[in-house]
Amino acid sequence: MKSTVDDIRRRFDADVERFSNMETGQSATVDAPLAMALIAEAAAATTPHARHVLAVGCGAGNYTLKLLEQLPNLDATLIDLSQPMLDRATERVGRATTGSVRAIQGDIREIELPDQGYDIVLAAAVLHHLRTDAEWRAIFAAFHRALRPGGSIWIFDLVESSIPAVQQLQWRRYGEYLTRLKDDGYRDHVFAYVEREDTPRPLLFQLDLLREVGFAQVDVLHKTVCFAAFGAVRG
């Protein structure tokens, strides 16, 4: 049985410091600093006149801070399950922008987003907690509605492969990365909480779904092993 929302919240409540490191990002995630930089640059390039960013699963605020290096002084709305994460993100983002900062603690599946309220949506290492195809469709459709025309969404996340044999290959290579990072025990620890907590979908599934809910342009910034950075622009 997969972790409940409360289980996930408690784990992140206790892990604020690890998610506050701008240099390493989340070390268990392959190429996290590169993905963070690519997403910030792509968001700025596609939505240069943005005024308001929505960060879903904002964690300690790293992705929002990286975006503010490219597009200074945006208004920011931050959403996270974890109140300690949200408190840290609000503090850090508040110091980095002259714009307004609004914090919302809760589950994105239960939060009603305003129509055309944002210019950029960031969703980093959060959507793999969605459970059913219906939830994925509903959330992607909500993101599309929440963006103003010309707005963009940028995602970095754990993804599956569409071909089972390739999934096994990528998972083996990810395990080798984790062992090199620390040791076999750390690999087994990460694999255990992914199995317990996460329900990722293939990159191709998500790209197709972005198109289906109405995004006009879809592209991939980076794909390595079982992680991908990608995005879409609303017409």
Please give the residue ranges for each predicted region.
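Core SAM-dependent methyltransferase catalytic element
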Residues: R211-G235
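Short glycine-centered segments of the SAM/dcSAM-binding site in methyltransferase folds
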Residues: H52, G150-S152
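Conserved class I S-adenosyl-L-methionine
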Residues: M1-T47, K66
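C-terminal alpha-helical "lid/dimerization" subdomain adjacent to the S-adenosyl-L-methionine
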Residues: F156-V213
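Class I SAM-dependent methyltransferase SAM/SAH-binding core
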Residues: H52-E110
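A short acidic, Gly/Pro-enriched loop at the edge of an enzyme's catalytic core
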Residues: L113-V121
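A short beta-strand submotif of the Rossmann-like class I SAM-dependent methyltransferase core
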Residues: A123-L127
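A short glycine-rich, Lys/Arg-flanked "PGG" loop and its adjoining helix->strand segment in the class I
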Residues: R137-P149
